[in-house]
Curated annotation (Swiss-Prot):
Keyword vocabulary terms for this entry: Cytoplasm, Developmental protein, Nucleus, Ribonucleoprotein, Ribosomal protein
One Pfam family matching this protein: Ribosomal_S2
Superkingdom, natural source: Eukaryota
Biased composition annotated in UniProt, kind: Polar residues: 261-270
GO BP, one annotated term: cytoplasmic translation
Species name: Drosophila melanogaster (Fruit fly)
Region (Disordered): 251-270
Record SUPFAM superfamilies: Ribosomal protein S2
Family: Belongs to the universal ribosomal protein uS2 family.
Protein name: Small ribosomal subunit protein uS2
Length: 270
């Protein structure tokens, strides 16, 4: 798929990321349509995926996404919790439309409901859990890209990207690689420069574990410093209240005394 170009070939750093995230580990069961992507079978029954074919299908999916003129017409879907954060991050960096969580039945086929949408392309995390949007897409001729495991059904799927879609780290890494490849094909980022967005942002985080980590981080923080109270010298002040009270008592007139009556008449009578 790379056409012999070294710039499009799978790099050693990307291979290391895939191996660490267990992207190459499939399940014990194999769908007959997924046999072409299986490299070999381990002694414990786990099937190993061919990462070279995974990379080729990833590039094909990225080219299909870039071919859509309006990115908002591309819907990225994940019903499983481990892929919801990755879907939201992918939509943020590629300007696509995310559906994280439960898919509303009839969103692609029932025109009278408020949630009706007409996407041009779907990208789903797991064909097993996201079977409802895949089925509705087949009714209205919407192409579908899916991350598939060795036991995933490929019915109504146009581009299958073989990977371990049951691991939180693996599915987060695959969404990150797909987002990076889309941005490279659009010309947003260069292939010679490392994408500054770390892959950890696409990984699923359990809310309970996140709360525990925050609580542990707070315990490691040093206790706040309490400043000691400083006694400031108090200047001696004169009690002005006594002097004011003395002057007031001496200067008050007796308003109860009889006033001198003045006669306004000429004879001095009232």
């Amino acid at each position: 798929m790379s056409g012999g170009l070294d710039i499009l070939s799978l790099k050693e750093d990307d291979i290391t990321k895939m191996l660490v995230a267990t992207t190459h580990l499939g399940s014990e069961n194999v769908n007959f349509q997924m046999e072409q992507y299986v490299y070999k079978r381990r002694a414990d029954g786990v099937n190993i995926l061919n990462l070279g074919k995974t990379w080729e299908k990833l590039q094909l999916a990225a080219r299909a996404i870039v071919a859509i003129d309006n990115p908002s017409d591309i819907f990225v879907i994940s019903s499983r919790p481990i892929g919801q954060r990755a879907v939201l991050k992918f939509a943020k960096y590629t300007d696509t439309t995310p559906i994280a969580g439960r898919f509303t039945p009839g969103a692609f086929t029932n025109q009278i409901q408020p949630a009706f949408r007409e996407p041009r392309l779907l990208v789903v995390t797991d064909p097993n859990t996201d079977h409802q949007p895949i089925m509705e897409a087949s009714y209205v001729n919407i192409p579908v890209i899916a991350f598939t495991n060795t036991d995933s059904p490929l019915r109504y799927i146009d581009i299958a990207i073989p990977c371990n879609n049951k691991s939180a780290h693996s599915i987060g890494l695959m969404w990150w690689l797909l987002a990076r490849e889309v941005l490279r094909l659009r010309g947003t980022i260069s292939r010679s420069v490392e994408w500054p967005v770390v892959v950890d942002l696409f990984f699923y985080r359990d809310p309970e574990e996140a709360e525990k980590e925050e609580a542990a981080a707070k315990e490691l923080l040093p206790p706040p410093k309490i400043e000691e109270a400083v006694d400031h010298p108090v200047e001696e002040t004169t009690n002005w209240a006594d002097e004011v009270a003395a002057e007031t008592v001496g200067g008050v007139e007796d308003w109860n005394e009889d006033t001198v009556k003045t006669s306004w008449g000429s004879d001095g009578q009232f």
